[in-house]
Amino acid sequence: MDFIPGSITAQTTMHFLPGWKKQGLSLPTADEWAYLCGGGCRTLFPWGDGLDYSMRLRWFEDMDEDENRPYDMEEPNFFGLSIAYDPYMREVVQADRLTTCGGDGGCNICGGLGPFLGFLPCSPHCKPEVQEDNELNGDYDFYRPIIRLENYD
């Protein structure tokens, strides 16, 4: 099966999984993804239950041309992961059906709902989204293979 950008499907996902398994990799489950995203915190976002409106947020703030740093949400969390920092980007997780976490494809932002509701899909507590049409967008959807430590005694 050839990989065609913009046409990632459940079948494409199934195509990659055996190769990852041979390398000791797999996709996180939705619960594992939420734990990784939250950095072990029990709040709505890794930094607390509200949105700090002084943060520089992608899609709402432009960086000055001389600034060579990531947007605030792109900074690594307590686990050192840059995860769930862009509401347009969704991560495929391991599930019985094609499921994503970490974004809504930008629906809330494009719908004009503002920064808080725009970034709410990036919360580790946002419900995983089953992709009913079994299709993913190659520009916004991606995989984060993980190594399960239980595999290494």
Which residues are covered by each model-predicted region?
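Short, structured beta-strand segments at or near domain termini in extracellular proteins/domains
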Residues: Y140-Y152
